[in-house]
């Protein structure tokens, strides 16, 4: 069973510590993994221990450790106890032989040249280990192939497998004439600590390759060195398997990329990239792809982050992108390019929403809305097609995106046309107008309508399709059946006094109408009465009475005016109405007899359904009529009772028959007859009354029942 090989940064202090302390797993504490010291630490009394007394239901209990946690800790402890000693690890090349020498960066004349010992950790998993193959055969094979690749390029390998001496800068320059800048691998050092080891997944071997990354003044692309190394990894990818059994392929078409002309890196040193937090076997690959972000388009980028809130993703035009050689263009057509860091990355928008335009059209000036005359603004919108006030920014951007998705950017968006307002809504707007209604100057009874009233639009704008002012005619409410009696009503209006015919002639009582006679238009015009001041009814008549006589115009304004005037007249005439006597119309004797007969038959029919007197007496509903009869009934009842009582045996007879037994000391005395009824019924007893009754019973049983001394233990007392 192959043991996992742990690789760590080549700092000597850290390496010395890691020999004694193994790496801890992601979810476990370090003290669990220590096999030597298993005693738990002493528990101190917490300063918040008093909270448990306050919050009684929620006690602070220690969580039980799960069985899975215990099993994994036991497995780890067993594996740690089977660790190889330090000398064997040094022989295999996992650890450096002399870690103190690795710290010395004071080479003659090259102070500060060594930046970092970069560790590239390539962990691979095998489905089944080949028998006869040692644990580090894969690592040796990988190193030998890398050494052969460097020799084929014409350079000797500048860094040995075990050595960490300070090598001169000329020998440490990587092959293919590459100068590595300082900011090339910013995340290499961080990734050393983040490489997650999974001991239970069959990790068989690791390759530890330490390379010295040096700072050099020349601006040469770093892609060729990585290509040469990664092509070596791709050659060995048949032996390298992922945990699921899939081959780890770092890059495809490596030979095609190596043939390209590498352009010099023209961008500034990149800032450190964020390190991916997922701890899987592809973390190193993601870091390698991030390291060559600035100059090359070799690897696939990680999925794009969502854009920050409030920023619009702007697609840079194609002309603004840096020009590439034709070899690069063939690669970028098949793979997405990695832009330099100073260029904002273009995030692909979600598929259902259309792309937002980069240029928002300027906002048209907002027109102030007059609040004083809402009734006058409504008809203006009918006459002239105005521009609607601009919507809010969010709504406008949504509308712009919708229009651009439908008709493109070239076509101007059409102005929305206002719908025609129906007539009844315009009438309601005119009636709800806060402006005072002024009568026309000609004195006619025509309702002054504000429907098509305008301030600045007169007859000049007649060509714009304006209609003339709509006359609203208001008449009194009229029932069609009353047209025949119109003449009689007019005569009755003239003689408004009540008329009663005395005698055998049937009398007709005329109740006066509450509406006085209407003045003609000419007389009202001479007297100068206004519509609001006139006490009579306001009868608005149109000039064309004959045509509109059949139609009754019952609008809300007519009902309002009619209600107001009739209420005022009624309130003024209340006293006269109360003083008038209600006179019933006289009828003949025959009619009265018929009415009486009808009432009698209905009463007889209803009375026949009533129970008789005998039935009511049997039900004890109807009492006997006379008081003497009641007294006689009482006497009869008393006589029956006395006869029954007289037939009772006497006390002597009962003693002789030994039914009654009297002791000698018992005295029979005559007691006064008293009322045995309680003060109140038992249903209305309060708790205090019940307590008093219980107390009285207990006192009686304890004091006055001395006769039953023998059975006193059986006496049942009531609770107090």
From Swiss-Prot:
RPEL repeat feature ranges: 74-99, 601-626, 639-664
Keyword Cytoplasm among record annotations: yes
Annotated Acidic residues bias: 481-494, 521-534, 542-551
Cysteine pairs bridged by disulfides in the record: none
Presence of the UniProt keyword Cytoplasm in the record: yes
Record's compositionally biased regions (Basic and acidic residues): 393-405, 626-636
Compositionally biased spans, kind Pro residues: 346-368
Stretches that traverse the bilayer: none
Keywords: Actin-binding, Cell projection, Cytoplasm, Developmental protein, Neurogenesis, Repeat
Recorded GO MF terms: actin binding; protein phosphatase 1 binding; protein phosphatase activator activity
Compartmental location: Cytoplasm; Cell projection, Lamellipodium
SMART domains per UniProt: RPEL (SM00707)
Region (Disordered): 1-48, 294-417, 454-568, 610-648
Bias type Basic residues, positions: 637-646
Source organism superkingdom: Eukaryota
Pfam families given in the database record: RPEL
A GO biological process held by the record: neural tube closure
PANTHER family on file: PHOSPHATASE AND ACTIN REGULATOR 4, PHOSPHATASE AND ACTIN REGULATOR PHACTR
Family of this protein: Belongs to the phosphatase and actin regulator family.
UniProt function note: Regulator of protein phosphatase 1 (PP1) required for neural tube and optic fissure closure, and enteric neural crest cell (ENCCs) migration during development. Acts as an activator of PP1. During neural tube closure, localizes to the ventral neural tube and activates PP1, leading to down-regulate cell proliferation within cranial neural tissue and the neural retina. Also acts as a regulator of migration of enteric neural crest cells (ENCCs) by activating PP1, leading to repression of the integrin signaling through the RHO/ROCK pathway.
Quaternary structure annotation from Swiss-Prot or TrEMBL: Binds PPP1CA and actin.
Stated name of the protein: Phosphatase and actin regulator 4
Species whose genome carries this gene: Gallus gallus
Source species taxonomy: Eukaryota, Metazoa, Chordata, Craniata, Vertebrata
Gene name tied to this protein: PHACTR4
């Amino acid at each position: 069973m192959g043991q996992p090989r742990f690789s760590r940064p080549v700092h000597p202090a850290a390496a010395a510590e890691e020999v004694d302390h193994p790496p801890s797993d992601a979810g476990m504490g370090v003290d669990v993994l220590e096999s030597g010291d298993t005693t738990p630490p002493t528990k101190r009394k917490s300063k918040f221990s008093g909270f448990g007394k306050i919050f009684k239901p929620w006690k602070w209990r220690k969580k039980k450790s799960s069985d899975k946690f215990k099993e994994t800790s036991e497995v780890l402890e067993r594996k740690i106890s089977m660790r190889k000693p330090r000398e064997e690890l040094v022989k295999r090349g996992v650890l450096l032989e002399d870690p103190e020498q690795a710290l010395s960066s004071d080479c003659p004349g090259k102070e500060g040249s060594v930046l970092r010992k970069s560790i590239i950790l390539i962990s691979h998993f095998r489905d089944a280990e080949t028998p006869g193959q040692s644990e580090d055969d894969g690592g040796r094979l990988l190193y030998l192939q890398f050494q052969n690749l460097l020799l084929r390029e014409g350079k000797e390998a500048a860094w040995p497998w075990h050595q960490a001496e300070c090598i001169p800068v000329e020998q440490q320059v990587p092959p293919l004439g590459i100068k590595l800048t300082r900011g090339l691998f910013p995340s290499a050092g961080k990734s050393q600590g983040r490489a997650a080891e999974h001991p239970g997944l069959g990790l068989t071997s690791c390759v530890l390759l330490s390379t010295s990354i040096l700072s050099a003044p020349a601006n040469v692309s770093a892609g060729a060195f990585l290509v040469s190394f990664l092509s070596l990894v791709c050659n060995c990818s048949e032996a390298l398997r992922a945990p699921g059994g899939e081959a780890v392929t770092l890059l495809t078409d490596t030979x095609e990329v190596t043939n390209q002309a590498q352009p010099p890196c023209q961008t500034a040193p990149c800032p450190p990239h964020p390190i991916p937090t997922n701890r899987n076997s592809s973390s190193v690959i993601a870091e390698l792809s991030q390291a060559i972000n600035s100059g090359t388009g070799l690897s696939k980028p990680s999925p794009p982050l969502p854009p920050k809130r409030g920023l619009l993703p702007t697609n840079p035009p194609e002309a603004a992108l840096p020009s590439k050689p034709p070899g690069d263009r063939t690669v970028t057509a098949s793979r997405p390019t990695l832009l330099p860091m100073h260029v904002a990355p273009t995030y692909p928008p979600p598929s259902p929403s259309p792309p937002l335009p980069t240029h928002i059209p300027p906002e048209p000036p907002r027109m102030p809305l007059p609040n004083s005359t809402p009734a006058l603004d409504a008809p203006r919108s009918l006459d002239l097609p105005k521009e609607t006030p601009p919507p809010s920014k969010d709504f406008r951007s949504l509308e712009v995106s919708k229009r651009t998705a439908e008709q493109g950017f070239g076509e101007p968006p059409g102005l929305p046309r206002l719908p025609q307002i129906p007539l009844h809504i315009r009438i309601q707007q005119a009636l709800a107008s806060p402006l005072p209604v002024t009568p026309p100057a000609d004195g006619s009874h025509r309702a002054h309508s504000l429907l098509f009233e305008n301030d600045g639009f007169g007859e000049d704008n007649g060509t714009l399709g304006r209609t003339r002012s709509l006359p609203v005619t208001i008449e009194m409410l009229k029932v069609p059946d009353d047209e025949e009696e119109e003449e009689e009503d007019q005569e009755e209006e003239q003689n408004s006094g009540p008329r009663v015919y005395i005698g055998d002639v049937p009398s007709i009582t005329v109740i006066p109408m509450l509406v006085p006679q209407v003045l003609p238009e000419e007389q009202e015009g001479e007297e100068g009465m206004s519509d609001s001041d006139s006490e009579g009814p306001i009868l608005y008549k149109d000039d064309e009475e004959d045509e509109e006589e059949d139609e009754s115009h019952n609008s809300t304004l007519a009902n309002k005016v009619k209600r107001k005037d009739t209420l005022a007249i009624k309130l003024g005439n209340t006293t006269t109405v109360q003083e008038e006597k209600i006179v019933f119309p006289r009828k003949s004797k025959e009619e009265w007899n018929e009415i009486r007969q009808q009432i009698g038959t209905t009463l007889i029919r209803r009375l026949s359904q009533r129970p008789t007197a005998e039935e009511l007496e049997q039900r004890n509903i109807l009492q006997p009529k006379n008081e003497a009869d009641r007294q006689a009934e009482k006497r009869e009842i008393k006589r029956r009772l006395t006869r029954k009582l007289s037939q009772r045996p006497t006390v002597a007879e009962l003693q002789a028959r030994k039914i009654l037994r009297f002791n000698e000391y018992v005295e029979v005395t005559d007691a006064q007859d008293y009322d045995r009824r309680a003060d109140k019924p038992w249903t209305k007893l309060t708790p205090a009354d019940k307590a008093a009754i219980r107390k009285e019973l207990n006192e009686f049983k304890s004091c006055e029942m001395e006769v039953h001394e023998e059975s006193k233990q059986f006496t049942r007392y009531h609770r107090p």
